Amino acid sequence: VSESNPYRLRWQQDAHDVLGEFLAAARKENLPALSWTIATSGALVGDVDSLNSTPDGMRAAFEAWTGWLNARGVTDRMRRDGVTHLYAQFRRGEGATEVRGAIRADIHPPFDEEPS
């Protein structure tokens, strides 16, 4: 096992702790559920659910979380295939226990619409 493994595990534990705070706040503030991933770098990524939401619902979920997190670097780009990609970065904590992450959403056009 690499010497850097203890660091990676600590970073993941820090992200796990922050995720626990996020889930508690989501219950309290009625924020929508996201699919969360903790990377080996300790980055925490929340993806808006595309299977159980409408395009408007996905955008609303993205905006709810980015607003609550005071996220920055928010981007809203439409790809050639008509998919809108939303992305924003956030930070939680300070110093050695700071956790960085992102909120993402890929909003596909409704099936009855052709991409332009």
What does each model-identified segment do?
Residues 1-116:
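Structured alpha/beta or helical-core interaction and ligand-binding surfaces enriched in interleaved
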